[in-house]
UniProtKB/Swiss-Prot annotation:
Its EC number is 6.3.2.-. This is Elongation factor P--(R)-beta-lysine ligase. HAMAP family: EF_P_modif_A (MF_00174). PROSITE patterns: AA_TRNA_LIGASE_II. Homodimer. ATP binds at R100, N101, E102, N109, E244, L245, G300. It comes from Proteus mirabilis (strain HI4320). GO terms for cellular component: cytosol. Gene3D superfamilies: Bira Bifunctional Protein, Domain 2 (3.30.930.10). The keyword ATP-binding applies. GO terms for molecular function: acid-ammonia (or amide) ligase activity; ATP binding; lysine-tRNA ligase activity; tRNA binding. Keywords: ATP-binding, Ligase, Nucleotide-binding. It catalyses: D-beta-lysine + L-lysyl-[protein] + ATP = N(6)-((3R)-3,6-diaminohexanoyl)-L-lysyl-[protein] + AMP + diphosphate + H(+). InterPro entries: Aa-tRNA-synt_II, aa-tRNA-synth_II, aa-tRNA-synth_II/BPL/LPL, EpmA, Lys-tRNA-synth_II_C.
Length: 325
């Protein structure tokens, strides 16, 4: 008889049945709003340049690639979905597998389900409202509240994140007993992220979902810079019961600016001893052809269902997490 004891799913069959129903309801939510479901590749010849993301790599050795064609498992379907938008797809969503060669734990699995959708003609606030509608439907929770990134820092840390210098940020870190990390950190955004995780996140989204919006422009990623305040980006995140659920943008449409951001990311990667990543030229070509003004958001489905079912770990809603795969 086999000595392997962990062959069974980590999630109960009852939870998997509830998960299937929630997934079905999510699809109905978008069908009722006329949003097209799409499928895009799970592998690509290019990948993200983000210094915080680590993709899985593989090789295709089939016909036409005898020397091996390097491919990356997708950390997000974003680039391919924006190529569809540039081809006049209209509003689209996708619920599929993504892969990140990073953490595995209470809220993380290297293979996970992402819900991502894009809304032409939506500004950031209108998309935030739609995310709120979905959360209320799936979680049966109260309507959300919203705080700007600046308001959140002022409320919980009594510091303005848009103007404070690194020395001031280190002073606040010391009050949170984080000097051992902050005193040697030279990157201002890393210091801000340290303070946000330790001094802001524990206070937000406890009773109702909380949107944090207008992140510093230096953390724009693929978001537009605000036309009203060039210190901030049109970017938001959503938190509920200690869990980061979603990350959204009013999407950057300028191909030249996007290339500059990718190149800046790669310079940072090299400085940090990380591999330089290939830039997705097809994605940039789509931006050059014309990405419509739009907003988009990526939401972690496993985390959402974990909250909906009131369980403690995403392994309670995934049949076979990485250590049982």
């Amino acid at each position: 008889m086999s000595e392997i004891a962990d062959w069974q799913p980590s999630a109960s069959i009852a939870n998997l049945l509830k998960k299937a129903k929630i997934v079905s309801n999510i699809r109905r939510f978008f069908a009722d709003r006329g949003v097209l479901e799409v499928e895009t590749p799970m592998m690509s010849q290019a990948t993200v340049t983000d210094i915080h993301l680590c993709p899985f790599e593989t090789q295709f050795v089939g016909p036409g690639a005898s020397q091996g064609l390097k491919l990356y498992l997708m950390t997000s379907p974003e680039y391919h979905m924006k190529r569809l938008l540039a081809a006049n797809s209209g509003p689209i969503y996708q619920m599929g597998r993504c892969f990140r060669n990073e953490e595995a734990g209470r809220y993380h699995n290297p293979e996970f389900t992402m819900l991502e959708w894009y809304r032409p003609c939506f500004d950031m606030y209108r998309l935030m409202n739609e995310v709120d509608d979905l959360l209320q439907e799936v979680l049966d929770c109260e309507a959300s509240e919203s705080l700007s990134y600046q308001q959140a820092f002022l409320r919980y840390l009594d510091i303005d994140p848009l103007s404070a210098d690194k020395e001031k940020l280190r002073e606040v870190a010391a009050k949170l007993d984080l000097s051992n990390i902050a005193d040697t950190e030279e990157n201002r955004d890393t210091l801000l992220q340290l303070l946000f995780v330790s001094g802001v996140e524990p206070h937000i989204g406890l009773e109702k979902p909380t949107f944090i919006y207008h992140f510093p422009a230096s953390q724009a990623s693929l978001a537009e810079i605000s036309s009203e305040d060039h210190r901030v980006a049109e970017r938001f995140e959503v938190y509920f019961k200690g869990v980061e659920l979603a990350n959204g943008f009013r999407e950057l449409t300028d191909a030249k600016e996007q290339r500059l951001r990718f190149e800046r990311d790669n310079r940072q990667r090299v400085a940090m001893g990380l591999p330089e990543q290939p830039i997705d030229e097809r994605f940039l070509a789509a931006l050059e052809a014309g990405l419509p003004e739009c907003s988009g958001v990526a939401l972690g489905v496993d985390r959402l269902i974990m909250l909906a079912l009131g369980v403690e770990r995403i392994s309670d809603v995934i049949a076979f997490p990485v250590y049982r795969a």
